[in-house]
């Protein structure tokens, strides 16, 4: 079976802002009709990469292509084939929702009739039809984000770049946005999604590139990244701290390796390769020793753990160098 053509490709991207290196040789790609997740804290270089792909920044080294066009040599062709929704909604808050979409359509040279028709289609699709005639200033944050995403789809671009589209949304609005994104992919759109929400990347992206300090520190599918931590593990929390050493010995006998201990939480953790079979053996061993268990379970590594292992820190909020430069 032939592979889908690459709709996004970046090779060796480098970008400096004064003494700050925002990108230090970044590579990634996305095939047609797939979702590529760029995962990392703000300041890692995600937004800088997006700004290069959308022709808003020129790389200092390396090159990138979108829909087969070089972003430096053919910027107009790239712009005609992309949609962009950034971290902040870019709609006009003093226009109605419908007027915002019609305006975007007219800027893309649609006729007034075509622009109105497309606006109504998108308002319906994004569940904004009832608010079509309301001033956007009175929209909720989730509604503004949906309208902003709708505006990026007025001309149905084959490539859509979403820069942290759900940051600041409540859980219900975030899940609604996820549903919209999944529908777009089903329709054949290629998406590049930057996010600091690990659950979001796990849910939406078929391939993830983890960026930290301007470098890709790992890449693969969510499952591949999780497996890189060593497969499944058994977590045990016992009731009586005095039994911790006894529990340690019992678990070690059951699975053939010593577990890691957290005395403060009265917890033992051990990696296993036989899954449910190992869990059954641990339960029996603890029962034989008369150890009271508060919680026990077989768990897979999470993207949170992958990210922490790769970067040494969690996804804290710091400024992106490209944004600092632009705002100076």
Locate predicted features.
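ABC-family P-loop ATPase nucleotide-binding domain
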Residues: 1-14, 313-328
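ABC transporter nucleotide-binding domains
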Residues: 5-10, 15-212, 217-218
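Hydrophobic/basic alpha-helical segments enriched in Actinobacteria
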Residues: 14, 20, 33, 44, ...
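Preference for bulky hydrophobic residues occupying beta-strand positions
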Residues: 15, 28, 236-238, 270, ...
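ABC transporter nucleotide-binding domain
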Residues: 179-273
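Topological signature of polytopic alpha-helical transporters
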Residues: 254, 267-269, 284-294, 315-328
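Conserved short beta-strand edge segments in small beta-sheet-based binding/regulatory domains
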Residues: 260-261, 292-299
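Short proline/glycine- and acidic-rich turn/helix-capping motifs at secondary-structure junctions
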Residues: 264-273, 299-309
């Amino acid at each position: 079976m032939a592979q889908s053509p690459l709709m996004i490709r970046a090779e060796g991207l480098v970008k400096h802002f004064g003494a700050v290196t925002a990108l230090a040789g970044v590579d990634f790609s996305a095939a047609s009709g797939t979702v590529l997740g760029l995962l990392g804290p703000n300041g890692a270089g995600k937004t800088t990469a997006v700004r290069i792909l959308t022709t808003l920044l020129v790389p200092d080294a390396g090159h990138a292509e979108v829909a087969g066009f070089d972003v430096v040599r053919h910027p107009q062709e790239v712009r005609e084939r992309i949609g962009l929704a950034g971290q902040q909604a870019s709609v006009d808050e003093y226009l109605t929702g419908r007027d915002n979409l019609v305006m975007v359509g007219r800027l893309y040279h649609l006729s007034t009739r075509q622009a109105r028709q497309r606006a109504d289609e998108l308002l319906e699709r994004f569940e904004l039809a009832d608010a079509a005639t309301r001033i956007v200033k009175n929209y909720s944050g989730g509604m503004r984000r949906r309208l902003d995403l709708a505006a990026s789809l007025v001309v149905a671009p084959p490539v859509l770049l979403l820069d942290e589209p759900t940051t600041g949304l409540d859980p219900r609005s975030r899940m609604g946005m996820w549903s919209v994104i999944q529908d777009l992919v089903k329709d054949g759109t290629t998406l590049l999604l930057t996010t600091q929400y690990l659950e979001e990347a796990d849910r939406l992206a078929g391939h993830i590139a983890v960026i930290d300090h301007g470098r890709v520190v790992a890449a693969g599918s969510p499952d591949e990244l999780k497996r890189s931590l060593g497969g499944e593990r058994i977590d045990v929390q016992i009731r009586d701290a005095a039994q911790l050493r006894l529990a340690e010995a019992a678990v070690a006998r059951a699975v053939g390796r010593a577990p890691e201990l957290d005395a403060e939480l009265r917890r033992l953790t051990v990696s296993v390769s036989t899954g449910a079979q190992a869990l059954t053996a641990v339960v029996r061993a603890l029962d034989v020793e008369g150890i009271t268990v508060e919680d026990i379970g077989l768990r897979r590594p999470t993207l949170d753990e992958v990210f922490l292992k790769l970067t040494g820190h969690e996804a804290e909020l710091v400024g992106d160098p490209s944004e600092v430069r632009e705002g100076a």
